[in-house]
Amino acid sequence: MSSSSELGNASSVPLQFLLFIDDRPNSQDSVQEIGQCLTNLLDGHSHDLQILQISKHPHLVEHFRLVATPSLIKLQPEPRQVLAGSNIIQQLQKWWPRWQQELAMDPNPEDTGQSPSCPREISSVGYSGELMKMSDELFLLKKDKEELLQQIQFKDQILAMLAHDLRSPLTAASIAVDTLELLQHKPIEEQKPALRSQLLYQARKQFKIMDRLIEDILQASKNLNSQFQVHGRPLAIADLCQEVLELYQAKFSKKNLTITYDIPKDLPNVFADEELIRQVIANLLDNAIKYTPAHGSITVGALHRTTQKVQVSITDNGPGIPNSKQETIFEGHFRLQRDEQTDGYGLGLSLCRKIIQAHYGQIWVDSRPKQGSSFHFTLPVYR
């Protein structure tokens, strides 16, 4: 008998076996017991037993469609046969008489001088396993290539979108500065102080908008490189909103809330990470439910805001948020005064902002005290 722990070159012995084992400590005991049983049963018959760990040969496990360990495969003489489970020794004892008959009907090729037709089975199986492994690796490489091409296309789209977003405030600021320059060259009596102040205010406002856009870009880059692994895909945001709403039906019913769904059917797909955006929608819905009184209403809507962006909005008729706090609620651990005894918005909205920024989108709130709140976020349209 010959035995090895790796799939090697085929021998021309009349009996060939593969024994698949797992990594459990008692696997070696099974190997010894099965090997000893084969030696006893096959006394006088040369045979080859190769021992393979399933963790090292997953493609062969798939090739032979194995579902249990240990598994003993008789490759030769044909037909191939699989014995599996904890009672392999009993199965060997049962099948050995039949195998003796098969050996008698299939004389040893070495004795007849004929070229062996099946002893190369082990080598061919190993070759098939390698082909399957290479095929899987090629598939993964093609998938990675498609994802990279999508990411490159997405980056190009984002650059165009950012250029468009920056152009508007830049144009407005330039007009204000040009007008100020014209006023500067007029006689003092023709210079209008009120207009001058208004133009200065307008220019500062537009510069602040540009500064905020640039800060969002830098933050998005930071989030992509550290906290988040964004796996962008074409995403039907309407379907995702509907799925999340269905999961919250019990909570809506518990407070007798009226839910309005206002998302058009022709809304274009966005390019986003489905699971991350699901977290954002779920978090905003959690907050809306928490702060909406019993028998209140919540509206989930979306619109194609521009050719490059889709805006999603979640509106409640809760107590609202003071104007002075509408920016700070997106900071980690922030609590409104009304939330000191509750969980509040906390890290939830901070996480939402980071997720949306990582998608090169924006998130904000429109609210007035005692008039409810509308949380909005934008995502880039998939092209």
Curated annotation (Swiss-Prot):
Coiled coil: none annotated. It holds the Pfam family HisKA. The modification Phosphohistidine is found at residue 164. The keyword Phosphoprotein applies. Keywords: ATP-binding, Biological rhythms, Kinase, Nucleotide-binding, Phosphoprotein, Transferase, Two-component regulatory system. PROSITE patterns: HIS_KIN (PS50109). GO terms for molecular function: ATP binding; phosphorelay sensor kinase activity. Disruption phenotype: Deficiency in glucose utilization and/or glucose intolerance in the absence of light; no longer grows if less than 6/24 hours of light is furnished during mixotrophic (MT) growth on glucose, no heterotrophic growth (in complete darkness). Accumulates glycogen under MT growth, but seems unable to utilize it. No expression of phytochrome or its response regulator (cph1 and rcp1). Residues 161-383 form the Histidine kinase domain. GO terms for biological process: circadian regulation of translation; circadian rhythm. The N-terminus interacts with KaiC, while the C-terminal histidine kinase domain autophosphorylates and is probably responsible for self-oligomerization. The N-terminal domain stimulates the C-terminus to autophosphorylate. Homooligomerizes. Interacts with KaiC1. Interacts with KaiC1 and RpaA. Binds to the B-loop in the CI domain of KaiC; SasA and KaiB compete to bind to the CI domain. This is Adaptive-response sensory kinase SasA. It comes from Synechocystis sp. (strain ATCC 27184 / PCC 6803 / Kazusa).
